[in-house]
C-alpha cells in the first residue's frame, strides 16, 4: 500500500470527524460510547494543523493534528483496517521539520498499543501524571536523532 500524506482541506472534515469518533470509541473502550460526539473533532482540532494519510484509492487511512507553536501532537488516529501498515509512521515522517523538530504528545497508559507505537518510533517518556480519563505520562517526547526514519 502506498500512503500519501497531505494537508487536510475543508472537504476532508466530514471523513475526519467520522474517523475521529470511531477511533476514539474503539480506543477508549472503557469510556461509555456516548461520551464521544461527532462535533468533538471541530472543538479539539481548532487552530491545529491537520495532515491526512490516504491509501492508493484516495481513502482516508489516518490523520494527525498538531498544535504547531508547541510542536504538540494532539491527535494521531489510524483507521483500524490500516493498523500496522505504516500509516502512523508516514504521518510522523510528513510532519514539518521531522525528524529534527522535537515533537511532544500525551498518551493514556491504558492505550498500550499507542504507547508501543510511539516507543517504536523513538519517543521517550519525560513525565507522568493523571488525566480525567486515566493515568498518563504527562508528556512523551520524540528523541533526536530519529535514525529509524533516516
What are these regions (language model features)?
Residues 7-81, 92-96:
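Acetyl-CoA-dependent GNAT
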Residues 88, 92, 111-114, 131-137:
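Short glycine/proline-centered loop/turn elements that form peptide/ligand docking sites
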Residues 48, 134-141:
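Short hydrophobic/aromatic beta-strand or adjacent loop that forms the aromatic wall/cage
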Residues 79-85, 109-110:
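Active-site acidic-Proline motif in GNAT/NAT acetyltransferases
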Residues 84-97, 116-120:
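Conserved acetyl-CoA-binding loop-helix of GNAT-fold acetyltransferases
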Residues 1-11, 143-150:
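Conserved N-terminal entry element of GNAT/NAT acetyltransferase domains
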